[in-house]
Amino acid sequence: MAIHGYDGKAALQQVNQFWSMLDDMCENNPEEYRSFIQRQMREGAEFHSPPQSHTCIRTAVLGANEGILYINICGWKRVPAPASDKEPVPVCGGRMEKLTEEKEEYSVVDAAFNPEVLQTTEKDKEEKENLCLLALNFIQQQHNLTLSQHYKLTNDKIKGSIRDTKQRLMSTKTCKSTLNGSQSEPAPSLLQQICSLQNTESDEDSSIELSIEQERKPARSGLIEVISSTELDQPQPQLPKHQLTICPDGNGSSRILQLCVELPGVRSVSQCQLRISEDDILLEVEDIYYLLLPFPELVKEETCTAKFNKKKQTLNVTVNVL
């Protein structure tokens, strides 16, 4: 997947330096290395945490496409906080969805701010009103709409569910600093450009073991996997065939969620990127497959293990249910 304004060669040089640093740290200071890896995993879990509902406003779409619009204002740790009180306030928005509930037809869209911004506005009624207007104007510009500036706070903090909100935000995410009008896709950090899947070869079944468990010792070979991207006009990725089941574990004391994904055409784990949170899983194979799957129940993402079978070209993911 291409990233505009992203220098692939420079990033790969940084990754090589980063790998060298980790290699030295693991060899010379194992405790510091372990602490570093665990800290990155905690921060990664926070980054992939779902948005939190805050306020829902109801307004009207004017003009040819007139109708009712609900805007969910939520907190999301993926959205950066402004560097200071004088800096622009970043906001992210997702796709708009048209729904029908009972006899009411309406549209719903989401505007996400950093949680610290929302906490600040809670202390000041005027600031909260300004935040609502910022969200309203942002959605108006993002979707090229004419919206009524008169809105009403709903009794519920969110229209729909957090899961739906997260899917809309992740599908076509746009970020903007609301005070200066600059708009851009958020650039991924260095660690986000590195595949975090650990792999070990098995001669018996030609499979590759993948794990994100914190307590396992990191493998010396293949701990970090560099993924480069190029600007190519490729067809849209397909939704792979998959099966999701929940069953008791071997002891019968808890339940596990099992996901089997068929990936025909995939021959190497280096093609796969896997991210998991407590309520969903994201699997990407560049330009081939894309799967964003909500879980029917919350899971303990730190217990997730995955196994890629090269012969069958399948990925099997197992994780404990909360």
From Swiss-Prot:
<dbReference type="GO" id="GO:0005737">
    <property type="term" value="C:cytoplasm"/>
</dbReference>
<dbReference type="Pfam" id="PF08190">
    <property type="entry name" value="PIH1"/>
</dbReference>
<dbReference type="InterPro" id="IPR012981">
    <property type="entry name" value="PIH1_N"/>
</dbReference>
<dbReference type="GO" id="GO:1990904">
    <property type="term" value="C:ribonucleoprotein complex"/>
</dbReference>
<comment type="similarity">
    <text>Belongs to the PIH1 family.</text>
</comment>
<dbReference type="Pfam" id="PF18201">
    <property type="entry name" value="PIH1_CS"/>
</dbReference>
<protein>
    <recommendedName>
        <fullName>PIH1 domain-containing protein 2</fullName>
    </recommendedName>
</protein>
<dbReference type="GO" id="GO:0097255">
    <property type="term" value="C:R2TP complex"/>
</dbReference>
<dbReference type="GO" id="GO:0006364">
    <property type="term" value="P:rRNA processing"/>
</dbReference>
<dbReference type="GO" id="GO:0070286">
    <property type="term" value="P:axonemal dynein complex assembly"/>
</dbReference>
<dbReference type="GO" id="GO:0000492">
    <property type="term" value="P:box C/D snoRNP assembly"/>
</dbReference>
<dbReference type="InterPro" id="IPR050734">
    <property type="entry name" value="PIH1/Kintoun_subfamily"/>
</dbReference>
<dbReference type="InterPro" id="IPR041442">
    <property type="entry name" value="PIH1D1/2/3_CS-like"/>
</dbReference>
